[in-house]
Amino acid sequence: MTAFAYIGAALAEIAGCFAFWAWLRMDKSVWWVVPGIASLALFAYLLTLVEADHAGRTYAAYGGVYIAAALLWLWAVEGAKPDRWDLIGAAVCLGGAAIILFGPRGG
């Protein structure tokens, strides 16, 4: 469930932020903000579904997933292919997220 919550949250957050980007930077209608706000609310809800004891750890691990998802958005939606440095950076971030999520915790 955690992986699906993180992936869904990342897509919802990026879509919500992109709606504001489209309105403010691409001269789209202010009505783009309406689904953007709904998407950002969905993002916040989905993060509550992550199986973790502490919100801060959930958010920290989510950061790596967000970075990887943002690069997929860059490619799939904006048509700009990530370069090797983007991919290396995303791999490092996902590694960090895995350490945060799966690292042994003292009692």
From Swiss-Prot:
It is a multi-pass membrane protein. GO terms for cellular component: plasma membrane. InterPro entries: UPF0060. Keywords: Cell inner membrane, Cell membrane, Membrane, Transmembrane, Transmembrane helix. It is found in: Cell inner membrane. The chain crosses the membrane at residues 4-24, 30-50, 60-80, 87-107. Belongs to the UPF0060 family. This is UPF0060 membrane protein Sala_0701.
